[in-house]
């Protein structure tokens, strides 16, 4: 089933050649990301299927939405997904490692929004599937490298939006602080009201301000979603 096209309200995604399939984390980030500063240029780091870039193309009027993907199969598939969408003229995917991309682009015009659903399993466990491991494990793109690179590519009033494990939140805040990036909003995500917090959605920028912190609960019970979650993703999912 996971190799079938995933149909959203305004676009469809083929994912049969992508190691990491569409999941809740990516949809959450794409729907949650703040567009209140009306970004003209967006960069999606580690785009995979192209999901988040496509969601932001639907949500925003940004003239330029770049994506970056190191794994060849995922890169090729994201390009096809972009071309098959209504926003192909605004979407472009680079096939490169992040450090190479930063070195090449840091003297160019900066991005108003940089967004990433980064690989975050830092355990030594490997599945045996090289592409899935590369997509999933933090040693493929360490959080430190991601934040440092993003700080070089972000415009003065730009935002860096991430979804990370809640267990990594403190580490992320320490790293961003050392690069003069500060959290202006944090949403902590839990599966149900009684379950522990699993994820942190964080928006950073270069302006220090009081951090708005809230929580998002996804389900009341199995496949019975909360109104707040449905409201967040209602423009994307065909049904909930």
Swiss-Prot record:
Task: Print the keywords alphabetically.
Answer: Cytoplasm, Methyltransferase, S-adenosyl-L-methionine, Transferase, tRNA processing
SUPFAM superfamilies recorded for this chain?
A: S-adenosyl-L-methionine-dependent methyltransferases
Q: Which reaction does it catalyse?
A: adenosine(37) in tRNA1(Val) + S-adenosyl-L-methionine = N(6)-methyladenosine(37) in tRNA1(Val) + S-adenosyl-L-homocysteine + H(+)
PROSITE patterns associated with the record = N6_MTASE
Where it mainly occurs, coarsely classed, is: cytoplasm
The keyword Nucleus is assigned to this record: no
Q: Which GO terms describe its biological process?
A: methylation; tRNA processing
What enzyme category does the UniProt record give? transferase
Location comes to: Cytoplasm
Give the superkingdom in one word. Answer: Bacteria
- From the record, give the transmembrane residue ranges: none
EC numbers for this chain: 2.1.1.223
The record, for InterPro entries, names: DNA_methylase_N6_adenine_CS (IPR002052), SAM-dependent_MTases_sf (IPR029063), Small_mtfrase_dom (IPR007848), tRNA_Adenine-N(6)_MTase (IPR050210), tRNA_adenine-N6_MeTrfase (IPR022882)
A GO CC term assigned to this protein in UniProt: cytoplasm
User: Single GO molecular-function term?
Assistant: tRNA (adenine-N6)-methyltransferase activity
Question: Which family is it part of?
Answer: Belongs to the methyltransferase superfamily. tRNA (adenine-N(6)-)-methyltransferase family.
HAMAP family linked to this entry: tRNA_methyltr_YfiC (MF_01872)
Name of the protein described by the UniProt record: tRNA1(Val) (adenine(37)-N6)-methyltransferase
Lineage, uppermost ranks: Bacteria, Pseudomonadati, Bacteroidota, Flavobacteriia, Flavobacteriales
């Amino acid at each position: 089933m996971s190799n079938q096209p995933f149909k959203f309200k305004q676009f469809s995604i083929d994912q049969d050649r992508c190691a990491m399939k569409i999941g809740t984390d990516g949809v959450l980030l794409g729907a949650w990301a703040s567009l209140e500063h009306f970004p003209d240029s967006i960069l999606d780091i580690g785009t995979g299927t192209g999901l988040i870039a496509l969601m932001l193309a639907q949500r925003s009027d940004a003239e330029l939405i770049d994506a970056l993907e190191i794994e060849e199969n995922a890169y090729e598939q994201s390009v096809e997904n972009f071309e098959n969408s209504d926003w192909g003229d605004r979407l472009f995917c680079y096939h490169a490692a992040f450090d190479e991309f930063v070195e090449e682009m840091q003297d160019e015009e900066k991005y108003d929004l940089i967004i990433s659903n980064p690989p975050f399993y830092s355990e030594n466990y490997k599945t045996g599937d090289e592409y899935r491991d590369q997509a999933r494990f933090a040693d493929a793109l360490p959080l430190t490298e991601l934040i440092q690179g993003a700080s070089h590519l972000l415009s003065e009033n730009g935002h860096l939006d991430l979804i990370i494990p809640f267990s990594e939140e403190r580490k992320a805040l320490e790293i961003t602080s050392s690069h003069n990036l500060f959290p202006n909003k944090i949403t902590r995500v839990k599966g149900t009201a009684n379950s522990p917090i699993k994820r942190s959605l964080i928006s950073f920028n270069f302006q220090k301000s009081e951090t708005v912190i809230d929580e998002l609960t996804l389900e009341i019970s199995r496949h019975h979603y909360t109104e707040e979650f449905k409201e967040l993703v209602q423009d994307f999912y065909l049904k909930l």
